[in-house]
Amino acid sequence: MKRTYQPSKLVRKRRHGFRARMATKGGRGVVAARRNRGRKRLSA
């Protein structure tokens, strides 16, 4: 059986990276919420 998590740096950055977050209104909200909470890492 194939495992569900097949790591790929490229796919990770494209799907969850900072630029992917900033591309949508919802994503900008996620980054803003993480900034307000004081997260060290805002995105993948």
UniProtKB/Swiss-Prot annotation:
Pfam families listed in its UniProt record: Ribosomal_L34
PROSITE patterns: RIBOSOMAL_L34
Keywords, sorted A to Z: Ribonucleoprotein, Ribosomal protein
UniProt GO MF annotations: structural constituent of ribosome
Gene Ontology terms: cellular component: ribonucleoprotein complex; ribosome
Gene3D superfamilies, per the entry: 1.10.287.3980
Region (Disordered) location: 24-44
Biased composition (Basic residues): 34-44
The keyword Flavoprotein belongs to this UniProt entry's keyword annotation: no
GO biological process: translation
Similarity comment: Belongs to the bacterial ribosomal protein bL34 family.
Record-linked HAMAP family: Ribosomal_bL34
Protein known as: Large ribosomal subunit protein bL34
Organism: Mesorhizobium japonicum (strain LMG 29417 / CECT 9101 / MAFF 303099)
